[in-house]
Amino acid sequence: KLWSMCRPEDIYKKPYTGLYCVGCEAFYLEKDVEDNTCPVHKKELETIEEENYFFKLSNYQDQLLELIESDKLRIFPENRKNEIVSFVKSGLEDFSISRSQERAKHWGVNVPGDDSRVMYVWFDALSSYINALGFADDEQGYTDFWAENQRRVHVIGKDIIRFHAVYWPAMLMSAGVPLPTELFVHGFFTIEGEKMSKSIGNVIQPKELVEDFGVDAVRYFLLREMPYADDGDISKDRLEIRYAELANQLGNLVSRVAAMTNKYFDGKIELPKVDWLKQDADLEDFMSHFNFKAYLDYTFEAVARANELIEKEQPFKTVKTDPEAAKKTLADACEIIRWVGTALLPIMPDSAAEILRRYSN
């Protein structure tokens, strides 16, 4: 349906010769590679010659530039937006949107009106965002979650940014379909600086990490280790360090404060009324910009403050001479822990729920 809705003048057929990577399922220009090698998979590119259908991307250069520079399509982080603006300004070339049945091994969606060709996987795959919602049959899900939704967000890896920030919006403009409103572009998890890849064989299995450390700890680790605008190098050793940090900083604080509260005040302390509006607004800003590392760093600054409070005031000592002062210290620590538990709900839902259960009023 999407193909058929595109403007007829935007799709045409011509012979094509290009450098192709099977792993990326993408063509590369000679100026974008060195030694005829795929920059992602480090394998030699194939020279492919065949007649294909092309999408006239050059028709949309000015519209795409205005769309991105005006933030009608917001791209995070800023360095990725700048990358795409530079790419569009350098001049857009029309791109292939079909493959021969032979090269596709007779697998794929046939081109409307031409059974000798199948749609190029990116035309097919990108349309899945809306087809999964019922676009092809005008279902309510498409209306609710795409056509009439105010936020249409894609979360993508940096290696496919051009497909999502340039090709996909142009296809949608041609078809008269609403565009995504935001793209969050993340880097790679790397092993010693190399992208994890099945073809290279340097893969860490998430299931094994979860079995060893639990899903909450792994989620925390991955979100805190990934720099906002770059790749994040990970290893099991790094996870063990973060896991110990989580236990020592947060786990120990939660257990220690609960134990003192139970021992000295029968587990009953009235929490102070604290205005967390600024902190909540800061967290909302981090989350709305998909800066999960900053979100967690900010949250754990509060954990550090609570630990410092306990070390400085030493309620386990002052309870003997000034129980009201000890109670206030523990109440303040309890309130910080309660706020931290709330902040961690989207990151570590099981652990956060347990914190809130223990520190509820």
List each model region and its residues.
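Short Cys/His-rich metal-coordination motifs, predominantly Zn2+-binding knuckles/fingers
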Residues: 22-24, 40-43
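Short, glycine/charge-rich beta-strand/loop segments that flank catalytic centers
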Residues: 14-27, 81, 185
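N-terminal Rossmann-like or analogous alpha/beta NTP/dinucleotide-binding catalytic cores
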Residues: 1-11, 25
